[in-house]
């Protein structure tokens, strides 16, 4: 199954807020609940919705998500917590959380077009796993800095998680440590994803 490129608001109406997918929000006061069945939710449906939230928020394919669940299952700590840490330490997600891109798909495009450096080296793989003390910068040309400049200026520094720091003048971000569960940008029950 490939990456989702269809209408994003349909997914937000179905699954709830997905800040990594889009900044748009559905119209308030519309009859969204009447369109979908509002009866008793089955356990399978609940687990599937949690899995789909995770997939669409981080922009993963089914195969990528299964690979991350498999890696997290081998860890000695809680599988759900390790899964979220793996997903949050992806380069495209860190760019989004730093405020260098408006959405995760936008951050993926910055990485794919070779505008981003990690520790002074060009990285063009959005799923690159960042480690503590990694320094994330833009290329030293005007075009790369211009792409990131508008997003950094409009981002809210109060929403920056504790495991990241950003220098807005030099367009430089730093990964301080591995993320805690309480700073994940998505409201999700990761245990249901692992059970699915």
Swiss-Prot record:
The lineage of its organism: Eukaryota, Viridiplantae, Streptophyta, Embryophyta, Tracheophyta. One of the primary rRNA binding proteins, it binds directly to 16S rRNA where it nucleates assembly of the body of the 30S subunit. With S5 and S12 plays an important role in translational accuracy. This is Small ribosomal subunit protein uS4c. It is found in: Plastid, Chloroplast. GO terms for molecular function: rRNA binding; structural constituent of ribosome. PROSITE patterns: RIBOSOMAL_S4, S4. Keywords: Chloroplast, Plastid, Ribonucleoprotein, Ribosomal protein, RNA-binding, rRNA-binding. Residues 89-157 form the S4 RNA-binding domain. SMART domains: Ribosomal_S4, S4. Residues 17-36 are annotated as: Disordered. One of its GO terms (cellular component) is small ribosomal subunit. InterPro entries: Ribosomal_uS4, Ribosomal_uS4_bac-type, Ribosomal_uS4_CS, Ribosomal_uS4_N, S4_RNA-bd, S4_RNA-bd_sf. The gene is rps4. It comes from Calamagrostis epigeios. Belongs to the universal ribosomal protein uS4 family. One of its GO terms (biological process) is ribosomal small subunit biogenesis. Part of the 30S ribosomal subunit. Contacts protein S5. The interaction surface between S4 and S5 is involved in control of translational fidelity. Disulfide bonds: none annotated.
């Amino acid at each position: 199954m490939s990456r989702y490129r269809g209408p994003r608001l349909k997914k937000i109406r179905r699954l709830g807020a997905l800040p990594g997918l889009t900044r748009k929000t559905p119209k308030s006061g519309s009859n969204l609940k009447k369109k979908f069945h509002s009866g008793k939710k089955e356990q399978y449906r609940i687990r599937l919705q949690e899995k789909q939230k995770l997939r669409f928020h981080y922009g993963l394919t089914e195969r990528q998500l299964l690979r991350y669940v498999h890696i997290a299952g081998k860890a000695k700590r809680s599988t759900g917590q390790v899964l979220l840490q793996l997903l949050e330490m992806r380069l495209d997600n860190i760019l989004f959380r730093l405020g260098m891109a408006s959405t995760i798909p936008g951050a993926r495009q910055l990485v794919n077009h070779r505008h981003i450096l990690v520790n002074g080296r060009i990285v063009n793989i959005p799923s690159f796993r960042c480690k503590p003390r990694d320094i994330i910068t833009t290329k030293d040309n005007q075009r790369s800095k211009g792409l990131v400049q508008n997003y950094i200026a409009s981002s809210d520094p109060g929403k920056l998680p504790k495991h990241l720091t950003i220098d807005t003048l030099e367009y430089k971000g730093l990964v301080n440590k591995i993320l805690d569960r309480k700073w994940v940008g998505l409201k999700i029950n990761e245990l249901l994803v692992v059970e699915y």
